[in-house]
Design a protein with these regions (language model features):
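N-terminal Rossmann-like NAD(P)+-binding domain of SDR-like oxidoreductases, especially those catalyzing
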Residues: 1-196
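Hydrophobic alpha-helical packing elements
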Residues: 19, 79, 111, 173, ...
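A short beta-to-alpha transition loop/helix N-cap that caps and shapes the active-site region
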Residues: 45-49, 151-152, 203-204, 268-269, ...
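NAD(P)-dependent short-chain dehydrogenase/reductase
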Residues: 53, 155-156, 167, 179-233, ...
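Residue-level signal for the nucleotide or nucleotide-sugar donor/cofactor binding architecture
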Residues: 75, 106, 114-117, 161, ...
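Nucleotide phosphate-binding site architecture
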Residues: 102-105, 150, 164, 201, ...
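C-terminal substrate-binding subdomain of Rossmann-fold SDR/epimerase-dehydratase oxidoreductases
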Residues: 218-331
């Protein structure tokens, strides 16, 4: 009798997105799992009528083996139950949400669907399947939060115990998702990890984050509006984030813990433009007032992640911008 081989798989909600797709490739490359199930609603959050940005969704997972793509919403219990019962994933990475704060701030209901409703639904679906399936050795539920949950930084550097006081819808919904993750996971005895990233950038991003906007305007010779010369963000290269997420979700010290997974060094928007100027000497920019509705941010401490899971980002902003430009074949 041939012994049935069970695949070790991961379910990634929002897996066609910038972060989810890179995570899927890395999980397979590092052989953490041998199959990734992608649950994505195929939504695009940029207007095809206005956008000058390339749609990278097809290219993100092109020619990647052992990927199964399922179309659907993470808040649909019928879909999540079907996928959990069929594949029994060891890991669930919940990245599905509106990708930008400015989009969520205009769509409170949609914002709550990804961070609140979907989080609750996934955890409840997981509990149902675990209770009705023998030998389901589930490893970790990973919730993707945001540095926006801190609101205005009260200090130059914030750590995971700093007060959470969001000042807009995006941060509020992300924090609500954290509370749901902790509450339901503790009640149902589900091992979880919460990730707080910041200003993620890198190749194949297409959702008009500030880094992408600045780079595209530099390439096109358009004027860059810098809203707040000293405005600081903890820019995090996509490879570093993905590496940190995998460490946090596979190390024992990551169980039932929250981590800032960033570069660990705040850099100003003016510094970002100055780095671009080295590659594009004729770059044009205008300094404008900062957006008063955006929280004042800076550096997120990564000491906890370094100590507990061995996280060490490798990509400086200078190196990350260079790699991004090289991908775009403009240098």
């Amino acid at each position: 009798m041939v012994k049935k081989i069970y695949m070790k798989s991961a379910l990634i909600t929002g897996g066609l997105g910038f972060i989810g797709s890179e995570l899927a490739k890395s999980l397979l490359k590092k052989k953490i799992v041998n199959k990734c199930i992608i649950l994505d609603n195929f939504g695009s959050f940029i207007s095809p009528l206005k956008s000058n940005f390339k749609d990278y969704r097809q290219q993100r997972l092109e020619n990647v083996k052992n990927i199964i793509i399922e179309r659907g919403d993470a808040n649909n219990q019928q879909i999540t139950l079907k996928l959990l019962q069929k594949y029994k994933p060891k890991f669930i990475y919940h990245t599905a949400a509106l990708p930008l704060a400015k989009i969520e701030n205009l769509n409170a209901k949609e914002a709550s669907i990804g961070s609140v409703d979907a989080t609750r639904n996934i955890l409840e679906s997981l509990v149902f399947v675990k209770n009705n399936r023998r030998n389901y050795n589930f490893k970790r539920f990973v919730y993707f939060s945001s540095s926006m949950i801190y609101g205005d930084f009260k200090t130059k550097i914030v750590n995971e115990t700093s007060s959470a006081n969001p000042k807009e819808i995006y941060g509020t919904m992300k924090l609500a998702g954290e509370v749901i993750t902790k509450g339901l996971s503790n009640y149902y005895n589900i091992p979880y990890t919460i990730i707080r990233p910041s200003a993620v950038y890198g190749p194949k991003d297409m959702n008009q984050r500030v880094s992408q906007i600045f780079i595209n305007k530099a390439i096109n010779g358009s004027n860059i509006n810098v809203h707040g010369k000293t405005e600081r963000l903890d820019f995090t290269y996509i490879d570093d984030l993905v590496n940190g997420v995998i460490l946090a979700s596979t190390r024992k010290n990551g169980i039932n813990n929250t981590f800032n997974i960033t570069n660990g060094k705040g850099r100003s928007l003016f510094e970002f433009v100055s780095i671009l100027k080295k590659h594009f000497p004729k770059i044009k920019f205008t300094i404008k007032n900062r957006d008063k509705f955006r929280p004042k941010r800076g550096t997120l401490s990564i000491k906890k992640a370094t100590k507990l899971i061995g996280y060490k980002p490798k990509t400086t902003l200078e190196k990350g911008i260079y790699k991004y430009l090289k991908f775009l074949k403009v240098i």
